[in-house]
C-alpha cells in the first residue's frame, strides 16, 4: 500500500519544477569538494555521491530494459555538467579540483579549460560579452544528465498500479501511527475528499514524504527519532522559456557559493526539460519559511518542536543566526536584484525575459550531538527503528539522485537476515549489477556498468 497526502503522486519536492533536476554525480557541484585550510581539495564526498548516482542509473537502466519505465528521454536527458568560476583564487581552486578528481576513474572523463575558444563552444551564453580581462575557467563532463524526477516517479507508480498486490491511496494523509505489542504497526488515514477513515496494519513502514517525513517519524514514537528536528528552507528560480535564448545553452553550469552563503545556495544556470519542453533555470534563491512542504502549513515548524528536540533546535537557532539573516535577506530581494545575480553567469540577461517561480521546500536535518546541543546537517539520513519495522528518509541534497542507494541501505538495515539469502542477493544484483562491490575502488566494474547505463539511458 502506498499512501499519498495529495490527490496525485510526485507533486511536492519530486515534481519537475520543484527541484533543479540535476542528476547529482559530483561532476559540477563545487560544494561537494571543499577546500581545506592548507589549500588542498577534499574529494571523498564527490566520489561517494558519484558512486551512489551510478546505482540509480543502473536501476533505471534495468527498469527501461524490462519495459517498466518508458523511453528514457521522458525522464532523463544528456546534459553536460560544467563548473564555471572567475577570479584568480577560484580559478586556482577549480584547477586543483580538476587535478584531484580527473585522477580518479569515476571522473576520468572530466575536461578543464581556460581557453576562450573552448568556453565559447562549451557555454556561449555565459561567455558572450563577458569582460575579456576577467580570468575564468571551467570543467566539463559531457555525459551529465537532466532528470525529471516527477515524470520518473509517476512512471514507476503507473507500472505499480498494474500489479495485483499494489494499492495507491490518494488524498489520504496519515493521522495516526502506533506500534502494537506484537511489533506490527497500526495506521489511520482519512480521505480528504470523502471523509472515509481507513485503518491499516502492517509489519513494515517506510516514511518517504520529503519534508513531511519528520512529523510522521515523530508520530511513530520510536526511540531513534529523539533529538531530530527540521530547518525548513524555501526556494525560488528565475525561469526563461524564450526559444532564442534557451537554444543557446545546453548544459548545467554550477558556480561557487558567495562567501558566507550556505552550501544550499550554490548558483547554477541549467537546461531543464520538463514534460518534453526545454527551458532555462537559474538559482536557487533561498528563503525563510515555516512550512515543511510547499502545500504544507505555516505551523509545520512550531508543530515539530518537542521536548525531545527542543534543546538541539534552540542550539542550532542560536549558532546559525547568520544563516537565518541570509535567508530572510533572500526573501526581500527584488526582481532586479535576482537578475543582477544571474548576470554573473549570463551578462546579457534582460529582466523581462525571466520570471520568478517557486521551487519545492527543503527541510535540513537538525541532529542532536553529544552534550545535548544540535547540529545542522546539509545531507540526507536514514533513521530506522532498532527492530527494523520502520524507517524514514530525512534531509535534502543530493536527495532523489541517490534515492536508489538510500533504499538499498533501508533494505540492508531493516531486513538484515533476508538480504543475506541467495535469493535476495541474486535479485539485488539483477537490479543493480554492482551491488556488493565498490565502484570507488573497482575501475573495471565501473567501466562495465557505466557503458551499459550510458547506452541504455541514451546519455553517451
Q: Language-model segments: which ranges?
A:
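Central beta-strand plus flanking loop segment that forms part of the substrate or channel wall
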Residues: 25-27, 224-252
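Core beta-strand elements of the Rossmann-like FAD/NAD(P) dinucleotide-binding domain
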Residues: 193-204
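An anion/pyrophosphate-binding glycine-rich loop and adjacent beta-alpha core
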Residues: 247-318
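Glycine-rich FAD pyrophosphate-binding loop
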Residues: 1-16
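Flavin (primarily FAD) binding-site architecture
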Residues: 207-223
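Flavin (FAD/FMN) cofactor-binding and adjacent substrate-gating region
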Residues: 70-79, 84-158, 162-163, 167-169, ...
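Dinucleotide-binding Rossmann-like beta1-alpha1 core, especially the glycine-rich loop
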Residues: 21-121, 279, 289-291, 297-300
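C-terminal catalytic lobe of FAD-dependent flavoproteins
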Residues: 134-143, 151, 288, 292-420
Amino acid at each position: 500500500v502506498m499512501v499519498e497526502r495529495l490527490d496525485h503522486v510526485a507533486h511536492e519536492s519530486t515534481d519537475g519544477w520543484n527541484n533543479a533536476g540535476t542528476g547529482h554525480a559530483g561532476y559540477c557541484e563545487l560544494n561537494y569538494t571543499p577546500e581545506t585550510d592548507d589549500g588542498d581539495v577534499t574529494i571523498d564526498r564527490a566520489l561517494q555521491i558519484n558512486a551512489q548516482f551510478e546505482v540509480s542509473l543502473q536501476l533505471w537502466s534495468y527498469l527501461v530494459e524490462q519495459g517498466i519505465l518508458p523511453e528514457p528521454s521522458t525522464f532523463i536527458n544528456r546534459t553536460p555538467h560544467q563548473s564555471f568560476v572567475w577570479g584568480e583564487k577560484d580559478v586556482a581552486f577549480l584547477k586543483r579540483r580538476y587535478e584531484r578528481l580527473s585522477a580518479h576513474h569515476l571522473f576520468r572523463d572530466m575536461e578543464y579549460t581556460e581557453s576562450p575558444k573552448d568556453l565559447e563552444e562549451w557555454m556561449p551564453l555565459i561567455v558572450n560579452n563577458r569582460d575579456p580581462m576577467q580570468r575564468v575557467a571551467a570543467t566539463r563532463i559531457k555525459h551529465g544528465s537532466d532528470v525529471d524526477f516527477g515524470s520518473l516517479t509517476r512512471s514507476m507508480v503507473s507500472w505499480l498500479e498494474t500489479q495485483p498486490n499494489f494499492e495507491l491511496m490518494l488524498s489520504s494523509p496519515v493521522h495516526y501511527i502506533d506500534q502494537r505489542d506484537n511489533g506490527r504497526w497500526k495506521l489511520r488515514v482519512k480521505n480528504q475528499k470523502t471523509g472515509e477513515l481507513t485503518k491499516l496494519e502492517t509489519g513494515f513502514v517506510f516514511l518517504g514524504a520529503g519534508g513531511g517525513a519528520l512529523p510522521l517519524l515523530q508520530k511513530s514514537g520510536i526511540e531513534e527519532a529523539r533529538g531530530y528536528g527540521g530547518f525548513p528552507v524555501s526556494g525560488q528560480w528565475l525561469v526563461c522559456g524564450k526559444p532564442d535564448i534557451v537554444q543557446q545553452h545546453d548544459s548545467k553550469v554550477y558556480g561557487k557559493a558567495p562567501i558566507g552563503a550556505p552550501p544550499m545556495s550554490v548558483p547554477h544556470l541549467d537546461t531543464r526539460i520538463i514534460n518534453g519542453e526545454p527551458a532555462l533555470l537559474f538559482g536557487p534563491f533561498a528563503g525563510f519559511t515555516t512550512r515543511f512542504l510547499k502545500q504544507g502549513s505555516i505551523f509545520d515548524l512550531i508543530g515539530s518542536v518537542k521536548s525531545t528536540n527542543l534543546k538541539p533546535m534552540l542550539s542550532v537557532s542560536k549558532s546559525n543566526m547568520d544563516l537565518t539573516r541570509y535567508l530572510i535577506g533572500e526573501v526581500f530581494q527584488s526582481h532586479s536584484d535576482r537578475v543582477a545575480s544571474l548576470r554573473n553567469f549570463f551578462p546579457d540577461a534582460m529582466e523581462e525575459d525571466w520570471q520568478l517561480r517557486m521551487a519545492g521546500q527543503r527541510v535540513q536535518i537538525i541532529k542532536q550531538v553529544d552534550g545535548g546541543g544540535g547540529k545542522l546537517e546539509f545531507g540526507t539520513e536514514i533513521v530506522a527503528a532498532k527492530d527494523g519495522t520502520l524507517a524514514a528518509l530525512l534531509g535534502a541534497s543530493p536527495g532523489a539522485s541517490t534515492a536508489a542507494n538510500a533504499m538499498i541501505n533501508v533494505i540492508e538495515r531493516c531486513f538484515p537476515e533476508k538480504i543475506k539469502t541467495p535469493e535476495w542477493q541474486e535479485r539485488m544484483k539483477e537490479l543493480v549489477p554492482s551491488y556488493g562491490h565498490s565502484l570507488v575502488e573497482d575501475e573495471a566494474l565501473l567501466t562495465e556498468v557505466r557503458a551499459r547505463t550510458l547506452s541504455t539511458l541514451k546519455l553517451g
